[in-house]
Design a protein with these regions (language model features):
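Core domains of carbohydrate- and sulfate-ester-processing enzymes
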Residues: 7-9
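Cys/His-rich zinc-coordinating modules
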Residues: 4
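N-terminal secretory/targeting leader peptides
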Residues: 1, 11, 15-129
Length: 129
């Protein structure tokens, strides 16, 4: 990632290493997050109005869904499939790799490829390694 190669992007990594001894070796892409839904096609933001989405228990994800005039239900990922299967929530937002891994496509029939948030992971190491 070209952005991660700049001094400005590297500074938080250096600060973390200095304060904690934990070195961030790499940041990798986990894909872009998209909305899925059962029985409701989402093409424009207004299509999400009144729907209920499972989200991670994170204020930014909750506010994002609420900004669509939809309802956010913070829920563990392990509960997501059954919640969608039983109609507790209309859908969720996740990356394509996670949608495939969790097989949520079995209980969802629409995906909105809006790519609203990039999902990243980091590789860490302590100084001993």
């Amino acid at each position: 990632n070209a952005n991660a190669d700049t001094d400005r992007a590297a500074q938080p990594f250096k600060t973390t290493a200095e304060k904690t001894g934990i070195h961030i070796l790499s940041v990798v892409s986990g894909g872009m997050r998209c909305f899925t839904c059962k029985g409701h096609e989402i093409r424009v933001p207004a299509d999400a109005n009144g729907l209920t989405f499972r989200v991670m228990d994170s204020p930014i994800y909750i506010k994002m869904v609420e900004a669509l005039s939809a309802n956010a239900v913070p829920m563990a990922g392990s509960e997501m499939y059954v919640a969608m299967q039983n109609g507790v929530v209309d859908g969720h937002e996740n990356t394509i790799p996670n949608i495939l891994q969790d097989k949520t496509y079995e209980v969802q029939n629409w995906i909105c490829m809006d790519e609203h948030i990039p999902s990243t992971s980091a590789v860490y190491s302590n100084e001993a390694l």
